[in-house]
Structures are given as C-alpha cells and as structure tokens.
Amino acid sequence: MKKKGLKKTFFVIASLVMGFTLYGYTPVSADAASVKGYYHTQGNKIVDESGKEAAFNGLNWFGLETPNYTLHGLWSRSMDDMLDQVKKEGYNLIRLPYSNQLFDSSSRPDSIDYHKNPDLVGLNPIQIMDKLIEKAGQRGIQIILDRHRPGSGGQSELWYTSQYPESRWISDWKMLADRYKNNPTVIGADLHNEPHGQASWGTGNASTDWRLAAQRAGNAILSVNPNWLILVEGVDHNVQGNNSQYWWGGNLTGVANYPVVLDVPNRVVYSPHDYGPGVSSQPWFNDPAFPSNLPAIWDQTWGYISKQNIAPVLVGEFGGRNVDLSCPEGKWQNALVHYIGANNLYFTYWSLNPNSGDTGGLLLDDWTTWNRPKQDMLGRIMKPVVSVAQQAEAAAE
C-alpha cells in the first residue's frame, strides 16, 4: 500500500558521510531533580514501582535522526526555552528519535545557534542527547528513545541495512541502555521506527520477522538495563495469516497469535502509528460511514491489544495539519483523540516540530507560537501532571 511517502520533510543540509566508530562516553547519572522511579506494565496499564498508573502526555521532538545530528529548532531558540514551553503546555514525555549514524565519529552537529545555546558549544551529537536528557529530567520530563532510522538519510523497511547491520543496531541499543541505566529520566526504548515492506510478523523468517528481531533486541537491552520499557511497533502488512494493509508500523494484528515475549516480564508496550488523509489516501477514508467506521478498524488493527488486557498501547505517532471537523483530516484526528481517551491509551503526538512536511507541529512555523487548535484538541486527553516538587510535598505530609 502506498504509505505516507516522505512524511517527515526536513529542511536540513544533507551531509551523509558514513563511519562506524562510536564516540567515547561516560555513563550519565540522574540529576537530583530528575523524576524518580521506573515503570513496568500491568495488563494494559503502565504503572510505577508502587503500582500507580503513569500519567503521560507525550510528544515527539525530532532532529537527532537527521543529517543535522541535533534537535531541530535550536537554530531559532535555546533548548531550555523550548523545554520550558513543552512543560508549560503540560507535556511530561518526549519520544526522541535518533539514527545510528548519530554515533559515528564523522557525524557533527549542524544548525545550532550557539549564542542562544552556549552550553552546547563543542559537544558532539551524543553529548547533545545527554544535555537534552539532563535538562528534561530537571523539568520532570521523561524520555523514550526512538531508533528512528539506521542512517540519517531516510527510513528503512527493516531494522538493518548493509551499512548498519543488526549487530550494530543491537550494540548501539546496549550502549544507550548502559549509558542511561542510572538515570530514570530515560524510561524506554522504541526499537525501530515504522517497519514496513519486507518486514513481517510471525513468519519465522529470521531476516524479515520483526517480532523475532524485537525479541532479540529487547532481551539484549534488558540484559543491560532491566528497568526500561520496550516499545514495539507493528508492520504494514505481511502478518502470518493476515496480509491486510495498514500504515507503516501500524499493523499489530499479529500480536494476537504471535506476541513479543521477553526474558524480563512486564516490559512490552505496543506502539502503533496512525495517520490521516492529509498524509495519504486510504480506503477507509472513502467509506460512506467515515469517520464512524474508524473505531472498528482501530479495534481490529491494534486497539484490541489494550481492550483484551494483553499489554499497554502507546500511539507513538499521529498528527496532521487540520483539526477542523469540517474537513476529513480534522474528523480523523478528533476521532482518534476520542478513541485514545475513551480507551485510556497512551500517546506521543507527532510532533513538536513545525517542519514535518505533511503534518506540521504543535509549534507554528516561527518555532515559538503554540498551535492552539491542536492543543485544544489534545487537551481533551491530557492528564493532570504532578510535578516532582508536588510529589515530594505529598510524601512529606
């Protein structure tokens, strides 16, 4: 099925020099002000160490996966200013895309205004990731790392390429798990963004079966850091016994018969991606019953996982430019927001950035003004966030 094409249209300088030497690093510990504690799953819930359900309001902030090797927007504003705004708007979870090429010794950060970001001067890309995690933790914002692509040039169908083989994919994940294992600001790993094409589920083919690969990588990560959540996206079709087409990363029908099973229990979170007609036309958008037909499609494709109490569902990407109920994209977005809220699912909205070509962002093109119509829509499913200071005060009472 024709997916969304180049959904994430970036305005970057394409400098694609490949290398394989990782930057040296020192494991980064949690700042005293960071959010404390890790999470695990309990049926379809994500809960903390005391069994209290997590209250996440999430978004994506991309850039580290691109040839800029840094977060987008730092050419306009400071990292501190942007994180302050994210927190002010009620978000406490960032899905942070990266590429394996980020860690190559030849990769250098580009397009940063160092007058606005003097503390980033001289830092290499992974140190910029460190800085984002440090600053997010100081604000009570937690991080899910997202292996978005192998090389910075574009998406890949499978979790590996000739230049970035499976061994590199896993070794980088283990490196990150070790680097942040003492820092509960980082709570999870989204193993690979949007498997599609050749990627299969339940076929048993070691070179294409994404479920088996997710188990290999998930177990490798948990052998280093058993506290992380492991987020597993779907495929687009090619599911054993069911070749129905869906969005890249969105088809999780295979979980019913072929679930991901890890050595450490209660760590798997399934994370579909879902988009609207502003990204690509799909048959269900042309159904006369649209948008009333959508909940049944979501139930069948990925929503059943939560409804049947198999595991939590975190919708890792969804977004679009228009939220007006007078247009198809607005009808789709509002219907999905209602579905997420009605079924108590988790989400990370795509995206903070305005420079995602066919979805836009929560920021407008000036990189400063918040998109109020989108925020008003998402506000219906955003949960009250208790700050670290408030938690400490409550514990002292």
Curated annotation (Swiss-Prot):
The keyword DNA repair does not apply. InterPro entries: Glyco_hydro_5, Glyco_hydro_5_CS, Glycoside_hydrolase_SF. GO terms for molecular function: cellulase activity. Pfam families: Cellulase (PF00150). This is Endoglucanase. Its EC number is 3.2.1.4. It comes from Paenibacillus polymyxa (Bacillus polymyxa). Belongs to the glycosyl hydrolase 5 (cellulase A) family. Keywords: Carbohydrate metabolism, Cellulose degradation, Glycosidase, Hydrolase, Polysaccharide degradation. It catalyses: Endohydrolysis of (1->4)-beta-D-glucosidic linkages in cellulose, lichenin and cereal beta-D-glucans. Gene3D superfamilies: Glycosidases. The keyword Hydrolase applies. GO terms for biological process: cellulose catabolic process. The active site is at residues 194, 317. PROSITE patterns: GLYCOSYL_HYDROL_F5.
